[in-house]
């Protein structure tokens, strides 16, 4: 991943049998360091690093993990513009919940929503998806042990490191399925943090894990990094984390969203090596499966989209999510879909491709009595 450590920036010190190195303070103070780089979003391109996707059940964590895998394998934007993946490279995606048949559906859905076929050649070469729930040998990172600590790295870790050497990114979804220990055990959590960092160091890859959110945060809407279920040591050890949450009833009402079940809010809960670029309006919108003019099925897939902002005042335009938006001259226009909703090359072509396709089956009459033209 990153270049070998510059010898001068650290100096070996004598600490009996421990391999410790002291930072060269003079060099650090007087010489400009190389610029930071990222694998995807703000996940640092550094050995010994892991990040987290945190969210409740059904918050599309696995979908986002797949989008990230495709983006890094092909050097593309995540989900049509969520974050960049500046350089392509090999991705190994271990999925513990979704069988091969389901992953087939999802990859096919992603393919139908891509305008540029070049991604397929890249992913065919760079993306390994391993559906562990489909009868493969499982993957366990830590397990009970007779040793004093009570836990040890599972032999699977050595096999994972051997297989993933040279990869750019390793995704583990979900983390809880790969740990044979209580999530609340701090001793097991400390070993898990060390194991994830070790996997990154030994393979040269960044590591990204998905993990469930705790019940208190699901009820309160807390989006912080520490809302991950179980011991706080695991999210504390991550250098980047993203929280996914469904819309609350109040948020949907305040924003005049009539199809909240299609939306997932995206929040950057932690970015240790960068300023966080959070927006309260950033989300994934899950477009349902539809059929094009030729009778071809276009799979449902979540893509990046901005949540509508309800503007104050009786004369202010009031966008109706998924159905109607208002242009600068007050004329009603069809909302952009997917890639064209936010940014990215090919946005116009994407919107043109879907211009005549049906929208989600949601209310077609506005609260003020105006008929929706769609």
Where do the language-model regions lie?
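C-terminal regions of RecA-like/P-loop NTPase motor modules
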Residues: 4-6, 10-16, 164-166, 202, ...
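The Walker A/P-loop phosphate-binding site
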Residues: 7-112
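Conserved inter-motif catalytic segment of the P-loop NTP-binding fold
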Residues: 18-20, 86-183, 374
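Phosphate-binding/switch region of NTP-binding enzymes
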Residues: 52-53, 58, 62-63, 169, ...
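A structural alpha-helix within SAM-dependent methyltransferase catalytic domains
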Residues: 66, 70, 161-165, 197
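Hydrophobic alpha-helical membrane-association signature
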Residues: 68, 156, 188-192
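Conserved ATPase "switch" residues in P-loop NTPase domains
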Residues: 73, 77, 164, 200-201
């Amino acid at each position: 991943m990153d270049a070998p450590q510059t010898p001068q920036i650290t100096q070996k010190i004598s600490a009996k049998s421990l391999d410790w190195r002291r930072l060269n303070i003079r060099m650090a103070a007087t010489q400009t360091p190389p610029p930071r780089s990222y694998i995807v979003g703000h996940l640092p391109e550094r050995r010994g690093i892991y990040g987290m996707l945190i969210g409740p059940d059904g918050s599309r964590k696995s979908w986002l993990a797949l989008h990230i895998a495709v983006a890094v394998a092909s050097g593309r934007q995540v989900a049509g513009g969520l974050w960049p993946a500046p350089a392509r490279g090999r991705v190994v995606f271990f999925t513990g919940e979704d069988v091969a048949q389901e992953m087939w559906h999802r990859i096919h859905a992603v393919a139908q929503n891509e305008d540029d076929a070049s991604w397929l050649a890249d992913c065919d070469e760079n993306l390994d998806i391993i559906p562990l729930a489909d009868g493969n040998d499982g993957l366990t990172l830590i397990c009970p042990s007779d040793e004093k600590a009570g836990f040890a790295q599972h032999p699977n870790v050595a096999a994972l490191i051997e297989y993933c050497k040279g990869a750019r990114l390793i995704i583990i979804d979900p983390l809880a399925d790969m740990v044979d220990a209580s999530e609340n055990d701090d001793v097991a959590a400390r070993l898990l943090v060390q194991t994830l960092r070790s996997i990154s160091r030994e393979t040269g890859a960044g590591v990204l894990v998905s993990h469930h959110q705790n019940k208190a945060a699901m009820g309160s809407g807390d989006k912080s990094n520490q809302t991950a279920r179980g011991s706080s040591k695991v999210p504390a050890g991550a250098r980047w984390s993203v929280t996914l949450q469904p819309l609350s009833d109040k948020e949907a009402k305040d924003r005049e969203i009539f199809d909240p079940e299609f939306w997932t809010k995206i929040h950057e809960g932690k970015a240790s090596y960068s300023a966080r670029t959070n927006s309260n309006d950033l989300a994934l919108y899950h477009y349902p499966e539809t059929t094009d003019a030729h009778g071809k099925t276009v799979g449902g897939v979540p893509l990046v989209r901005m949540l509508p902002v309800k503007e104050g005042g009786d004369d202010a335009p009031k966008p109706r999510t998924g159905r109607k938006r208002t242009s600068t001259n007050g004329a009603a226009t069809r909302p952009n879909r997917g890639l064209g909703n936010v940014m990215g090359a090919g946005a116009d072509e994407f919107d043109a491709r879907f211009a005549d396709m049906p929208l989600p089956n949601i209310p077609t009459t506005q609260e003020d009595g105006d008929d929706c033209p769609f």
